[in-house]
C-alpha cells in the first residue's frame, strides 16, 4: 500500500445544494446527521475491488465556496453518500482509505488543523492533532489499524506511526521523499533514501538498503508493489530531469529498468507509474504544462500516446482493475474533474462522475486497496 494524496445526476446535485448543514462546527463531524439512510443502504459485505471512495464538491474553481460530499461508488456506478459539508473551503480533505475498507482518513485545515478518522459504516468520527502537528500520510496495512504521518526533517521527512486516535506509537525513521509503501502484510515498508530505497520494519528498524545506481540523489520514490517480491520505483537518472521506472527486488538483488531513459523529444517527460494489462504495458507519464499522460510501451521501449475521449488530456490513473484503468481527469479547461473507468484497448468508457464544467468536481478519489493502486 502506497501512502500519500458521468456528472452527478440532478438528484444528487440537488441533494448537495438543498440539504446544507447549519452547525458551526466543521469537519466530518459536521456532516453526519442527515446521511444515515444512504449509509445504511451500502452493501458493506460486497465492498472490495473495483469500489471507489470519492470526495466531490460543486464549488466553482478559483477559491469559491460550495457544498461537498463523500461518496462510495460501486463497480456498477451506484453512488452512496456517506457525508456532506456545507462549505468546501472548511471541509477536511480526503487523504486515505483503510485497506479493510472501514475507515477514511482526512486532513483538517480549518481551526487548529490536524486529522480526522471516519468509520464509514457508523459515521463515528475521531478528530485530533498528532504530536508535533504531524501531517497524515495514510493507513498501515493490512487492516488500517494505525496511521502513518510525517514531519519535516532537514530536506526530508521524519516518519512515525500513530493510533487511530492520534497517539504516538512508534518512530519509523527518516525518509528522503516522504513516501511510504507498506507491504500487504504490514510487517515492513519501503521509502526513499539518498541512493535509492530502503526496506524498514514496522518497528522502524532498517532491514536493508535497496540502492538504484546511476540515479540522482534523493530522487527515488517507491510507487507500488509490482509483485510480492518487487517494488516499482520512479527515479531520476543523473544528468537529466526525466524520471525512469525501475523494478527493485526487496531481496537486495540488482534492480532492472522497466522503461528506458526518455528524451524531451519523445513527448514523455518522465515515467511515474505503470500497469501491465492484458492488452499491454501502460505508463503514467509527466507531460507538458504539468499535465499527466498515458502511454503504451512496446517491448522495444517505444511509446504511443493513449488518448482518453471526452477529457482535457490530463489523465491521472488511480488504479487498474482487469482490463481497465480508473482515471481522474478534467473535462473542461476550467479544471472540472471527473471520474471514469477506461479500457485502453477498446476505448470503452464507464463514467462514474461527469462533473459540470463550472465546478471543481472530484477533489479526491481513492480506490479500494489493491497492489495496482497508483500513488500520485
Which residues does each predicted region cover?
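Solenoidal tandem-repeat scaffolds enriched in leucines and small polar residues
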Residues: 155-246
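Repeated scaffold domains used in trafficking and secretory/extracellular systems
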Residues: 40-43, 89-97, 132-140, 176-184, ...
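An edge-strand/N-cap motif at the start of beta-rich repeat modules
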Residues: 32-81
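Hydrophobic beta-strand positions that form the internal "hydrophobic ladder"
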Residues: 52, 104, 144-147, 189, ...
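Hydrophilic extracytoplasmic domains
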Residues: 275, 289-376
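Multi-bladed beta-propeller domains
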Residues: 74-91, 119-134, 163-177, 202-219, ...
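Structural motif
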Residues: 59-71, 112-117, 154-160, 194-199, ...
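Secretory targeting and sorting signals
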Residues: 1-33
Amino acid at each position: 500500500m502506497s501512502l500519500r494524496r458521468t456528472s452527478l445526476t440532478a438528484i444528487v446535485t440537488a441533494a448537495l445544494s438543498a440539504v446544507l448543514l447549519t452547525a458551526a462546527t466543521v469537519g466530518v463531524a459536521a456532516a453526519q446527521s442527515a446521511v444515515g439512510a444512504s449509509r445504511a443502504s451500502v452493501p458493506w459485505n460486497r465492498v472490495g475491488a473495483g469500489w471507489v471512495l470519492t470526495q466531490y464538491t460543486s464549488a466553482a474553481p478559483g477559491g469559491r465556496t460550495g457544498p461537498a460530499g463523500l461518496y462510495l461508488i460501486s463497480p456498477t456506478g451506484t453512488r452512496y453518500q456517506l457525508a456532506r459539508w456545507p462549505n468546501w473551503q472548511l471541509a477536511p480533505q480526503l487523504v486515505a482509505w483503510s485497506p479493510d475498507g472501514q475507515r477514511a482518513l482526512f486532513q483538517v485545515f480549518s481551526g487548529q488543523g490536524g486529522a480526522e478518522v471516519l468509520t464509514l459504516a457508523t459515521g463515528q468520527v475521531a478528530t485530533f492533532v498528532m504530536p508535533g502537528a504531524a501531517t497524515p500520510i495514510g493507513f498501515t496495512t493490512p487492516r488500517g489499524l494505525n496511521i502513518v504521518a510525517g514531519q519535516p526533517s532537514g530536506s526530508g521527512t521524519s516518519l512515525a506511526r500513530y493510533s487511530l486516535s492520534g497517539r504516538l506509537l512508534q518512530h519509523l525513521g527518516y525518509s528522503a521523499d516522504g513516501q511510504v509503501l507498506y507491504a500487504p502484510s504490514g510487517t515492513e515498508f519501503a521509502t526513499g533514501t539518498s541512493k535509492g530505497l530502503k526496506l524498514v520494519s514496522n518497528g522502524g528498524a532498517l532491514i536493508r538498503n535497496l540502492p538504484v545506481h546511476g540515479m540522482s540523489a534523493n530522487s527515488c520514490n517507491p510507487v507500488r508493489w509490482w509483485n510480492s517480491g518487487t517494488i516499482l520505483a520512479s527515479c531520476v537518472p543523473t544528468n537529466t530531469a526525466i524520471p525512469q521506472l525501475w523494478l527493485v527486488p526487496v531481496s537486495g538483488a540488482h534492480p532492472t529498468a522497466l522503461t528506458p531513459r526518455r528524451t524531451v523529444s519523445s513527448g514523455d517527460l518522465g515515467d511515474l507509474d505503470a500497469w501491465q494489462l492484458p492488452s499491454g504495458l501502460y505508463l503514467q507519464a509527466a507531460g507538458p504544462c504539468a499535465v499527466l499522460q498515458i502511454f503504451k510501451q512496446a517491448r522495444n521501449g517505444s511509446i504511443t500516446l493513449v488518448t482518453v475521449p471526452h477529457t482535457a488530456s490530463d489523465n491521472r490513473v488511480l488504479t487498474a482493475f482487469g482490463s481497465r484503468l480508473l482515471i481522474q481527469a478534467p473535462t473542461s479547461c476550467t479544471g472540472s474533474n471527473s471520474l471514469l473507468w477506461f479500457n485502453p484497448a477498446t476505448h470503452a468508457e464507464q463514467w462514474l462522475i461527469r462533473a459540470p464544467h463550472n465546478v471543481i468536481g472530484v477533489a479526491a478519489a481513492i480506490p479500494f486497496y489493491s497492489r495496482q493502486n497508483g500513488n500520485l
